[in-house]
Amino acid sequence: EHDITLMAVGDNLMHLGVVASGKQEDGTYDFSMLFQGISPFLNAADIRIINQETVMGGNSRGFSGFPYFNSPTEVGDAIADAGFNVVLQASNHTADQKLDGLLYCADFWKNKHPEVLVTGIHEDASQADDIPLLTIDDVTFAILNYTYGANTETLPLDLLGHLNLLCAVNEQTGQMDFTTLNPQVLEDISRAKELADIVIVCPHWG
């Protein structure tokens, strides 16, 4: 027998003051200082989870804070460089830059940091049923991530299948029912139990 340790932190919520703190003299951004203080603890864990609350929808859009965030991709670089190996990307701010921003964010993770398991969003809606898996010392973990909503009562229909939601959604109108659990959640958990030794569910409540 042996131990497998898990560390989870968040929310990594990039208000504009935090964004400004990472700006360098040459105009580039470096956010490594955000995680320097926790690195010794972080690197002692096997599973290192962070909730990246704000979307990285592309630097060319410009950066924005509350209520509709857009964060620098250098935040993602700092997360990966710090040693996080799981990123929870489903939050109420994931759709702040609409579908284009979500897709940019998903593509950034896939191509820039493929070593990081990103859960909660899908670049391809046909992959919405896929179960994110992480194997540590021959033990397989399913790590599921859902958000309660997306900063609106009505979800843009083009986001269906791209963002994991806790609430039920009318697929014709996009109306979200915050009192009813999305049946996809229980279906995912059921399939995850078949694929993994341990299932971890990370809901974003607010």
Task: Go through the PLM ranges and name each one.
Residues E1-G206:
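Acidic, metal/ion-coordinating pockets
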